[in-house]
Amino acid sequence: MNKEEQRKNSAAQSIRWHFPSIHPEGRKFFVIAVIISAIITYFSWLWMAWPLGVLCFCVAAFFRDPIRTVPEGDGLIVSPADGMVCLIADVPPPPELAGADGLGDAPLTRVSIFMSVFDVHINRAPVPGRIARIAYIPGAFVNADLDKASEKNERQHFMIETKEGINVGLTQIAGLIARRIVPLTKVEDYVERGERIGLIRFGSRLDVYLPAGVTPQVALGQRCLAGETILGQIGSQAKPLTGMRL
């Protein structure tokens, strides 16, 4: 690669860092909004064009797909979602992920991350490995911030098996506004840590089931970035974190 190509690549990367691309799942919504805005503007209905212009911006912002710097290290478990840690509790794994060949039946630490409509809604793999299970469960649409959302709402379970044979579970949960869970992977796919695996449209929550013995390295109320924030480390003897909102 010559210097001119390097310069162009560097400029393109800089633009992507400052102006994230729109995920393919959101491009059709963006195009529809732009076309409607253009038609209304053409017919001089300017009083409607402004709100639709704002709508175009909101659609682009919601489906933004920023680049993330994924940390490297043995056993690291990263956040699969942008948002705020709303719950940390020891609970039995869901039936769809339980069993001897799954997450087992004993309680595991579940870290729940609430995604508002302002957060990036691309979900990423917390660990590298094989997608061993995917299970979609239709359900209700109660507030995703509530504990019962894990059992009542529309949801999709994933189980990723690492090369060491350790299983990590995660669940996409639809919220009050979100009515569409979109998978980007399938069973038997191999994913890297931080790789895009799905998205939920318009506000939702994501639960991560940490393997036995893994201590969460986030605190209630902490903000997380998908693919970057470390939730825990397999094999680590770290102490639980506590935090204070100031």
Curated annotation (Swiss-Prot):
Sequence similarity: Belongs to the phosphatidylserine decarboxylase family. PSD-A subfamily.
Chain positions with Pyruvic acid (Ser) modification: 204
Originating organism: Zymomonas mobilis subsp. mobilis (strain ATCC 31821 / ZM4 / CP4)
UniProt-recorded name of the protein: Phosphatidylserine decarboxylase proenzyme
Subunit text: Heterodimer of a large membrane-associated beta subunit and a small pyruvoyl-containing alpha subunit.
Gene name per UniProt: psd
Entry keyword NAD: no
EC assignment: 4.1.1.65
GO biological process assignments: phosphatidylethanolamine biosynthetic process
